[in-house]
Amino acid sequence: MTEQRPLTIALVAGETSGDILGAGLIRALKERVPNARFVGVAGPRMQAEGCEAWYEMEELAVMGIVEVLGRLRRLLHIRADLTKRFGELKPDVFVGIDAPDFNITLEGNLKKQGIKTIHYVSPSVWAWRQKRVFKIGRATDLVLAFLPFEKAFYDKYNVPCRFIGHTMADAMPLDPDKNAARDVLGIPHDAHCLALLPGSRGAEVEMLSADFLKTAQLLRQTYPDLEIVVPLVNAKRREQFERIKAEVAPDLSVHLLDGMGREAMVASDAALLASGTAALECMLAKCPMVVGYRMKPFTFWLAKRLVKTDYVSLPNLLAGRELVKELLQEECEPQKLAAALLPLLANGKTSHAMHDTFRELHQQIRCNADEQAAQAVLELAQ
């Protein structure tokens, strides 16, 4: 940043979640430095905030080994071109938003040229492939972390890291309105309500839906008024779930929802879900939950040897204890899942204690992440 040149921030986002983060960061930076320039790889939200897109985000948004191999030459070309063009531009700071396989190497290339680099959103190095932390440390001047235990991990390896809180915690109210959510979904206020969230990936829906449906059948025996809501992320997952339900529980009445996962969580007395970001969202919705997860035996065997954490769900990792029940592999079966959910549906001491802890954890990670990220960028730019 000079008197002649405005503050120039280069950014690369590789998927929709990164585009949302990038847009929030740009917005917060523009409030402080209205004439700042933003360039790089951007999605529609970042572009709407004024980011100049050298490449469209969709160019990087490839998933799966086969897809990546098919696009490898193009991806390597883009990374080489960005290394050259950012090297010539000499931005005040480069921010790589998530997409670690693409961004961390790019960050390293730019850091060697004297450009200050930030990696926004820590990869799960604390959970597996922990040696990646050394590459991240060499490639970046700063990591921006959503969760406090991530910062503790980086501190252990002397890698500069700033805990900024989680954008999802900023976006969700501390005290959600359950009755308003029920009105939206058409659920009576006095009914018992269970949310089933069998995952967003095809493999998860295939592995979990049958057990989740059988669990709901068992719970309906105890709670005949039980309303069951099943939010599904897209038409493919809905079609897949409907096929499995027709085979396993054709007579079980459920509310199938297109998206609306957050509304389903807020409306429900309890949720049965696959692990992942959904568990964090469910915690922020203050919905007591049980995590059920199953994968192919070899994958599970491998995961047990690679994963270095005691828990798989983010609420438990945040709490540092088994706050929510995790039933994995052979434990993920209808009788055990139903037994774990029954006390939560009763809305007694168990669910009230869980709700209170969820609220405390929400407050811990509700730090105005966009503003914190913007402050970190400006401090590094000076």
UniProtKB/Swiss-Prot annotation:
Residues forming coiled coils: none
Keyword terms, alphabetized: Glycosyltransferase, Lipid A biosynthesis, Lipid biosynthesis, Lipid metabolism, Transferase
Pfam families assigned to the protein according to its UniProt record, in alphabetical order: LpxB
Gene Ontology MF annotations: lipid-A-disaccharide synthase activity; phospholipid binding
Record keyword Lipid metabolism present: yes
GO biological process: lipid A biosynthetic process
EC number: 2.4.1.182
Catalytic activity, as annotated: 2-N,3-O-bis[(3R)-3-hydroxytetradecanoyl]-alpha-D-glucosaminyl 1-phosphate + UDP-2-N,3-O-bis[(3R)-3-hydroxytetradecanoyl]-alpha-D-glucosamine = lipid A disaccharide (E. coli) + UDP + H(+); a lipid X + a UDP-2-N,3-O-bis[(3R)-3-hydroxyacyl]-alpha-D-glucosamine = a lipid A disaccharide + UDP + H(+)
Top EC class for this record: transferase
Organism superkingdom: Bacteria
Family: Belongs to the LpxB family.
Function: Condensation of UDP-2,3-diacylglucosamine and 2,3-diacylglucosamine-1-phosphate to form lipid A disaccharide, a precursor of lipid A, a phosphorylated glycolipid that anchors the lipopolysaccharide to the outer membrane of the cell.
Protein's name in the database: Lipid-A-disaccharide synthase
Species of origin: Escherichia coli (strain 55989 / EAEC)
Biological classification of the source: Bacteria, Pseudomonadati, Pseudomonadota, Gammaproteobacteria, Enterobacterales
